[in-house]
Design a protein with these regions (language model features):
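Domain-level signal for soluble alpha/beta catalytic cores
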Residues: 1-380
Length: 380
């Protein structure tokens, strides 16, 4: 797949809930309503998808009575996808979807074994590849991936879920996690999915130079949901979605698709977006940025860590200037970044970030400080 581009499907869960007006766990349909599962796969294939994911994202032990029921559910999900693929036009790839395990009383080793078991049953179900989706921490999946790769040498992808600042739900930097994962030989592909819309995901990919020895994937949400009559809804965002996915494709991303809020109409719009399929890798990306998998170590200057010292490490012989920047009240950080760069160029020594000034809801002060520090190299 490296060097080519594949169109993946969109969301199964949110589309299933909307299509059948139900709040039940979509994965239970694998055994209860297999014809529904097959029909949704067929809709995505008709829209132009070349890669479909099994309806097994939340097929975990916590959701089913016992291991036998879980195994039956996963194999049924594989069967539904396989039946749909047989009726597709051309080659169709089936990805076995694995979502995060529930954090409960089980030990770390037990959860690692659970990941390995789920992957094993997907392999037995005949999938072409495995995809670990929407992860915020990779500690437990790396050992499981090693086990699965030894069992069957099929491609394994890992997709992280991040916020608009590039951090996962566990408060970890996606750039650092991707760097760690890029060093794992058993992992064939990396990417981002869920959590954010196409605009923020495109902005994150603009800041990354992607190692060429890995497959890269991008599957953002349709946008950001709103609540209507006790249901989470997504606005129709297809035109903007396709436009931003065209930008992402130009960064060298091979697998393009969607997550929450997307449906077959979104995938059809991607299939018809010529910019996506004729996009060539933007070789200028990352020339002045750090490469995820091959980051050049930088020597930390004393001024970065000790704002009261000069470049030689001696205490500055001047009055120090500290400026407070309040985090934005929404996701738009353009003004605060402009202010930070302005202050950087006017001999300000350190920036401070208050936590919820005036008691108003704002962007997280720690994450905002981290972002400013990374982009300006100022002490915060």
């Amino acid at each position: 797949w490296k060097g080519s581009r594949l169109l993946a499907d969109g969301s199964f869960g949110t589309y299933y809930a909307e299509k059948f007006q139900t709040t039940e766990l979509p994965e239970t349909a694998n055994t209860k309503y297999p014809e529904r599962v097959k029909a949704i796969h067929e809709e995505y294939l008709a829209a132009g998808a070349q890669l479909i994911r099994t309806n097994t994202y939340a097929s975990t032990q916590a959701a089913f009575e016992n291991r036998d029921a879980l195994k039956e559910n996963i194999l049924a999900g594989c069967e539904a996808a396989g039946q749909a693929a047989q009726q597709g036009m051309g080659k169709v790839y089936i990805a076995g979807s694995i979502g995060p395990e529930v954090m409960d009383q089980r030990t770390t080793q037990e959860r690692i074994q659970e990941y390995a078991d789920r992957g094993t049953w997907l392999q037995q179900g005949g999938v072409d590849l495995l995809v670990f989706e929407t992860f915020s921490d990779v500690t437990e999946i790396i050992p499981a991936i090693s086990v699965l790769k030894r069992q069957q040498n099929i491609p394994i992808l890992v997709n992280l879920a991040v916020n608009q600042y590039g951090y996962t739900g566990a408060g970890l930097s996606a750039a650092k996690l991707l760097k760690e994962l890029a060093q794992v030989e058993e992992i064939d592909g990396l990417g981002l999915n869920c959590g954010i819309g196409p605009g923020h995901m495109a902005a994150l990919f603009h800041k990354l130079a992607l190692p060429e020895d890995k497959i890269w994937a991008a599957l953002p949400n349709a946008g950001y949901p709103y609540r209507l009559q006790s249901r989470m809804q997504f606005s129709d965002n297809r035109v903007y979605f396709a436009q931003k996915m065209g930008e992402i494709a130009g960064k060298g991303v091979e697998i393009i698709g969607g997550c929450c809020g997307t449906d077959p109409s979104y995938i059809k719009s991607l299939a018809e977006q010529r910019d996506i399929w004729k996009a060539e890798r933007d070789l200028s990306v990352g020339k002045e940025k750090e490469t995820v998998g091959n980051r050049e170590e930088k020597k930390a200057t004393p001024a970065l860590h000790d704002f009261y010292r000069d470049a030689e490490g001696a205490c500055k012989k001047k009055k120090l200037i500290a400026v407070e920047l309040a985090p934005p009240m929404n996701a738009d950080d353009e003004k605060i970044m402009e202010a930070a760069h302005y202050l950087q160029n006017h001999e300000v020594d350190v920036l401070t970030f208050p936590d919820s000034p005036s008691g108003r809801t704002r962007a997280d002060a720690i994450l905002m400080a981290e972002k400013v520090s990374k982009e300006t190299e100022m002490c915060v």
